[in-house]
């Protein structure tokens, strides 16, 4: 399973279109990503050279999602954030920190984690495949963190799922 993106839309060399979506235990995440990728498909059918997340895509995405933006489909807390998000949809729900966190609430079998923006500066955390980082400071919308092994610095979104490192000796 890809961890860097939830879905993808591609045109093959022979002109066919392919949509791939990761397997999710979260029905709302799956539905939203499917509609996101279908918006790419419909825009590609109609307009050959359009920006991937430009105005054409945003309008098509809104048109596809609006008919189901109601409490029959989405829980009230998620619906509230979705309606706000759809005013100017982003290329990924991950960039809408609050919406992303509400969607996460509906993940089944999710292991325990903390969001990076909920831990203190100076805290050591584990991310991804076990790399240890120290949270430094916020820079605009992202957090500057240092990999303890390589000393390289990385920027993380506040909704990055991390595990607090319990052992104080690195």
How would you describe each model-predicted region?
Residues 1-24, 48-169:
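Metalloprotease/metallohydrolase-associated module, dominated by Zn2+-dependent proteases
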Residues 32-45:
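Active-site recognition of the HExxH zinc-binding catalytic motif
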């Amino acid at each position: 399973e890809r961890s860097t993106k939830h879905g993808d839309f591609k045109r093959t060399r022979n002109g066919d279109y392919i949509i791939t979506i990761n397997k999710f235990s979260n029905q709302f995440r799956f539905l939203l990503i499917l509609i996101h990728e279908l918006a790419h498909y419909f825009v590609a059918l109609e307009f050959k050279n359009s920006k991937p997340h430009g105005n054409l895509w945003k309008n098509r995405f809104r048109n596809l999602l609006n008919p189901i933006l109601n409490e029959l489909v989405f829980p009230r807390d998620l619906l509230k954030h979705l309606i706000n998000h759809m005013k100017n949809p982003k290329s990924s729900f991950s960039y809408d920190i609050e919406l992303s966190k509400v969607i996460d609430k509906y993940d089944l079998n999710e292991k325990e984690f903390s969001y990076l923006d909920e831990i203190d500066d100076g805290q050591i955390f584990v991310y991804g495949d076990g790399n240890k980082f120290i949270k430094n400071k916020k820079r605009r919308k992202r957090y500057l963190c240092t990999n303890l092994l390589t000393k390289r610095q990385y920027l993380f979104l506040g909704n990055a799922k991390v595990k607090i490192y319990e052992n104080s000796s690195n």
